Every structure is written in C-alpha cells, then in structure tokens.
C-alpha cells in the first residue's frame, strides 16, 4: 500500500502547474469482520478499501476532493487527474482563505506496527469454549489500517498498524445485558479469556433482584469503559484552542485558572505508541501533548487554522482539535481491592447517552443502564435499576475523586463509519466519594 501511495504522490507532482501547491492524504484498510449472535458466527467477510484526499492550493485559496481508489494504478491516476482539473476550475470561484496556513517543512515520518494478529481458528474455538452456552452478540474486527500524507513541499508520512477489536454483549433471559470489549495490538488468549469470564460473572449478578435507589449522592466506582464515556465528552471541544478562544469549551474555567481538578488527574495526548499516525490530517507532525498535569491545565490542541486565527503556535492537532489518543495517568488503587475500597456504593461498568447539562460548569448527565451493581460491604448485591446521573467534572475528577486504578485499559474506537478508526484512549477506573443520581 505504501508503494501505491508513493506512486500517487509522484503522479500528482507531475501534473502540477506553476504556482500550485498540493497535499495528498491517504487512508486504507484490509479488515476482517465477523458478526456473532448466540455466540455463533452469523456473518463473516473482508473489506479492502483505499481513498485519497487531494487538496489544491493557489493564490491564497484552497479546495479539496476525496477520491476512491481502485488499486489499479492507471485508473487511479486518471481519477486523480480528473479531481485535480475539477479543483483547478473551482479555485477561482472561491474567496481568499484568511486562515490558510500550510506546513512548508519537508518532514518525514514512518511507522510500521506489524504485531501478529490472531487467526480466526484461534479466536472462534476460545469463544465457543467460554461463551458457547450464552446469548453473546458482538463483532470482531481485525487487520492493518494505513494512513499517509504528502505535500508538494516534500513532506511525507506513512503509518501502518495492525489491531483487533472484539466488542460484545451478553444477554440475560430478563432482557438485561453486560457489555464488554477486548481490543489492542498484542493478542493474548489469556487476557481475552479473563475478559469473557468477567463478563459471565457479571451476567450472573444480573439475575438477582434489582435494587432501586432513591435520588441522592452515592460512593461509586467507574470502570474504564465508563470513564471512556466521560473522557469522550471532554473530546467535544474540551481541549480545543478554537473552543477555548471562543468560550465554548467545557474546560473553560480550568484553562482560565478559575478551577482545578484533583492532583491525581493528568491527561495527555499520547500519540507515540498509539494506533494514530504521528501526523495530522492537515499535514503537520504530531507530538505528545500534556493537556492537564496534576489537575491543572497545561497545553491545548491547536490546529493550523486556529494558530493563524488566534496567533498561537500549532502543535499538530487535526481540524477538529479533538484528542486521537487520550491517556489518563494511573493511580494507586489495585484492581483486586476495588470492591473492598468501594465498601458500599455503585459499581458502574458503563455509562450511556451522555450529554452536557451545563457546559460552562462541565456538568454532564447520562444513564447507568445495565451492569451497574449495588455493593454493600465489598460484596455485589444485585443490579441497580436504570438511573440518571447529573454531576460536574470538577466533582467527579476533582473534589470527589478518591483514587484511580493502577491498571489501565486500552480502549480502541469501535467506529467503522466509512472506515475503521485509529482513535484510542488509555484509561484507569475511578473511585469517587460521591456521584449524584437525580432520577
């Protein structure tokens, strides 16, 4: 795939006219998908696809077009030439772009993460052995994902990474379910087995009589999957330079110095070693960015456009200025001590349907739904009926945060909208002294 991309770059270079500049992005995957129902294979197939994002720049104007690639070198060259000509015709019709900034450095980046992926004849027997008698519904996706970038200034980046993602739910006869996931780059049959057995154990607890709680504040443990939902809300402009400059960030008070989180909280955009490429879709090299350190705001994610508009220094963020590999530093809580340290309170496996109830206060709301359990004296008593929580980040990860787990979970995005995502998060679980349930 890299060779095909290099040929495309050469083709566009050869077709350029005087005064023109270009950037060329490349996305490709070779993925294997398997869908399960009642722990049986119901659908299996492979997807091999590639596309290019061509941007033409001239005289302060820019236009871009996406081109689906066939794998046939001659046909793809023709498609790019057609796209290039259409962009040439479009540019004179556009207004000058006041925030157009191109990285004119001839940087080079190359990353090849070829971790061996499990064979299906290894995954399927394990699944049958551990969950063949259960109502398991889910999807397995695996294979290499590629990203490329090149420009007429000589920049060239290539990223290729193997990964797998098993996302499933175990359904109880009463209609409730346990949702679980196992994903990463280094497959471990033992780790997958442990995750399946943990989900099976939680499924057994769903058969107990439901516990109904009154609205109020309760001690709670948020598992990494639940923390991923909370962290995902912060990615909605929380660290964005544009959102912060215009007053539309949930972390406005934190970055203004008017509030802080617990000293236990340190968030980093950890691109190195992640599934995400070390360059942005805008064509700038990416480095690790400390976002929050010991509860205090540090850097923000700055795209080239925001840098131009607000007179900042770009740091490789893409156009959305959203983290692609968010990492939260671990704490001191051992996994084996979670229930003991929780004592009496809520064990929350997942959160659902999160939204902001008060953006400036970083207050968010959502549902607990399935696999939230009531714990007394370190022992799970039963599932909790669906409840709505409404609480501020400055409480959950601030004044009410008691500890974070020593062990963290690598959570890969399950998004396959158009193509498999390279996004990820690396998160611990969180023990909080108080979580507010409203109804």
Residue ranges with predicted function:
Residues 1-277, 284-287, 293-296, 379, ...:
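Active-site bordering "gate/hinge" segments
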Residues 254-439:
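Dual-mode signal for accessory low-complexity, basic/Gly-rich regions
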